[in-house]
Amino acid sequence: MIVYDSHIHMSSRHPASPEDFLKKSSAAGISGGLILSIPPVGNPDAYGVDIPAFERMEKVRDFCKACGPEFFPCFWIDVLEKDAVEQVKLAKETGMRALKIICSRHAPSACIPVCREAVKYDLPVLFHSGILWDGVDSGNYNRPCDFECMTEVPGLTFALAHISWPWTDECIAFYGKMLHANSAHKRNIRLFIDDAPGTPDIYRRNVFRNFALLGYDLSETLLFGVDTNVSNYNTEWVEYTLNFDRELFASLNDEFQNFDGYLAKAVFEKQNKPRPDLNDWFTNSTSRNLLRFLGEIR
């Protein structure tokens, strides 16, 4: 079975070869994933290195091509650049499969024009959410409820990365709000949750336990990721996270199948779905759900 890592970075400071990356990713049990382009100069992670948008697209596209068809290129876009909306069309034409946005210097509402264009070109958006180790004042732009403005972009597919740590409870509530936006207000928004650390291992049990016991089924919307990079793919960290999550969901499933909370029961009845097996949350997060996010399958 193909195992996807949905959160892999490229860096301008640390060039990487596809061959070396594939050796490490294969050793960790990863056979595909979403690779994020070198960051734009406006992001602190660029460390002042200014590479034109098209060149950054080409670099990640060519790297993915060299790695094989199960690796998908994602363009990291700065929505404050004057031609940001035009870059979305260019990204589609260049073969990008998704957009990456980090709100380091602006509120998520500044992303709306780019996100509307992303809907037009059928490109999903991976947002950073949660605290940022970026050395600047950015926390107030990255809480889950800051992304309520995405209700103004019907048809958008987007993901919140890192389960929004440390605002994980807010992330759960936001997920519920988006479910309601679709059912009651026909927004046709698809929200995914990227579980890349981010959220430390000591928090993960309670986060996923609360998702489950509230009746919010992540079977088709959870994305497994590790948030490492192609130049120094951390096989030990990847293996640890895979094994940790596999065991976590198996242990949570026993409690979940015997839980009869009022809200969870109401959610299950409204969705007219059987109670999910939480082992499927893990299996799908590492396999089918990235393809769902990218629109390969529904």
Task: Annotate each PLM feature.
Residues 20-24, 56-63, 87-91, 110, ...:
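A general structural detector for well-ordered alpha-helical segments in enzyme core domains, enriched
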